[in-house]
UniProtKB/Swiss-Prot annotation:
Record's protein name: Fe-S cluster assembly protein DRE2
Residues annotated as signal peptide: none
Region Disordered: start-end pairs: 190-246
Binding-site positions, [4Fe-4S] cluster: C374, C377, C385, C388
Record text on subunit structure and interactions: Monomer. Interacts with TAH18. Interacts with MIA40.
Pfam families: CIAPIN1 (PF05093), DRE2_N (PF16803)
Annotated region (Linker), positions in chain: 193-261
GO CC terms of this entry: mitochondrial intermembrane space
Biased composition (Low complexity): 199-211
Protein localization: Cytoplasm; Mitochondrion intermembrane space
Protein species of origin: Candida albicans (strain WO-1)
Annotated residues for binding of [2Fe-2S] cluster: C281, C295, C298, C300
């Protein structure tokens, strides 16, 4: 029987530039499996007896970017070659770890130049970290251990089978539980039972009503009925809703009471017991001091007085602010008038300088013997001092006449 070992060789981009290094890496892989080299196009296949080794070489950047699609659960080994010794350049992203996990078969291994500071990410991806003895090289000692990431074999979950309950036979006979039986009644029995139920309900309701009425009489709610106050035994009459002593109030009597101002004695006695007048706030109760604030539901007029005081204060403030605004505007107008007068006076006091035609025609600044302190007036502004009379003029020759045109327009 022939068996095959599929190996994926992932190379760092810096390794691909050296062809000899790539061939050395391949030969080491073959030597580790004790096989002979036979190159067949894109993949290298070697056979020894009944074992076939398929070696696939890819650049890791193309695999991570998805340019090259590789089959899942296909490779027995994946070897990563990275010549960088620093740990920061050996870091493998989590997305690449997950892809390698999918490419490997169960119990497949990912080995080579692996990072040492990503063990947590490796375990979270699903790998198991194992240690293997590194192959002997010139710079390495025998027995040196390196980390290898192994894809574990999936464990089959145990299947729980439901079994039927065994029936045990015994000599003792057990009675089976049966549903309750209902007996159908005759018409006479139904009528008698209904009468008994109704009689019991009526007696219970009467007892409950009597007890409730007695409790109401004993509480403070008894002042609503005058008959209950006179009864000493706490019994309640059946005609509680009808009060013979209730007095009927006529609407005309109410109108007459307001018009007569208590002159009508009948109306006054009638309404004095029925009308409720609000109690005025007594200042003397608070030690002669006025209350700070009216009640929430004030009916004595204190709330209206407070609102009137607030409105009066607002009116006073508005008047004062209006007067202040008027005075401020008047002062601003006066200040503006003063400034205008000062500007007019300053313009009148200015002295105008006038030049004659002789002064404007020709001005000779280049008379020999008349030079500045620096002695380089004719050379230009770059060589003139701060107080030079020739500043702004072009270079000239000594004795040359300089004419100033349009000098009068600037005055």
């Amino acid at each position: 029987m022939t068996s095959s070992i599929n190996i994926l060789l992932l190379l760092h981009p810096t390794v691909v530039t050296d062809a000899q290094l790539v061939e050395q890496i391949k030969s080491k892989i073959y030597q580790s499996h004790n096989n002979n080299n036979n190159n067949n196009g894109g993949t290298t296949t070697t056979t020894t007896g009944t074992v076939n080794i398929n070696l696939n070489q890819q650049i890791i950047d193309r695999v991570t970017k998805g340019i090259i699609e590789l089959p899942y659960d296909y490779y027995d080994e994946i070897i990563y070659i990275n010549p960088n010794n620093e740990s920061q350049y050996r870091e493998i992203p989590i997305s690449l770890m997950q892809l390698i996990y999918k490419l490997l078969k169960s119990n497949g291994k990912f080995k080579g130049d692996l990072p040492l500071d990503q063990n947590l990410d490796v375990l979270m991806t699903g790998f198991i970290i194992e240690e293997e003895e590194k192959e002997k090289e010139e710079n390495n000692l025998e027995g040196e251990l390196v980390n290898v990431w192994v894809k574990p074999i999936p464990v089959d979950e145990p299947v729980v089978t439901l079994l039927k309950k065994k029936t045990t036979t015994s000599n003792t006979t057990t009675k089976k539980k049966s549903l309750p039986l209902f007996k159908k009644l005759n018409k006479d029995e139904i009528n008698n039972s209904d009468k008994d139920i109704n009689n019991d309900n009526i007696t219970n309701n009467n007892n409950n009503n009597n007890n409730n009425k007695r409790k109401l009489v004993e509480t403070k709610l008894t002042y609503f009925s005058s008959d209950d106050e006179n009864s000493s035994d706490g019994s309640v009459s059946e005609n509680d809703d009808i009060d013979d002593d209730d007095e009927l109030i006529d609407e005309n009597d109410l109108l007459n009471f307001n018009n007569n101002n208590n002159n009508n004695t009948n109306g006054g006695s009638l309404l004095s017991d029925k009308l409720i007048t609000p109690r005025k706030c007594d200042i003397s109760l608070n030690g002669g001091k006025k209350r700070k604030k009216a009640c929430k539901d004030c009916t004595c007029g204190l709330k209206e007085l407070e609102e009137l005081e607030v409105s009066n204060q607002q009116n006073l403030q508005d008047q004062i602010l209006g007067k202040l605004a008027q005075s401020a505007t008047l002062e601003a107008i006066k200040i503006e008038e003063r400034l205008k007068q000062q500007q007019q006076q300053q313009q009148q006091q200015k002295v105008k300088v006038k030049f004659t035609e002789e002064d404007l025609s020709e001005i000779d600044f280049t008379v020999q013997g008349k030079t500045g302190g620096c002695g380089s007036c004719a050379l230009g502004d770059a060589f003139r001092c701060d107080g030079c009379p020739y500043l702004g003029l072009p270079p000239f020759k000594p004795g040359e006449v300089v004419k100033l045109d349009g000098f009068g327009e600037d005055i």
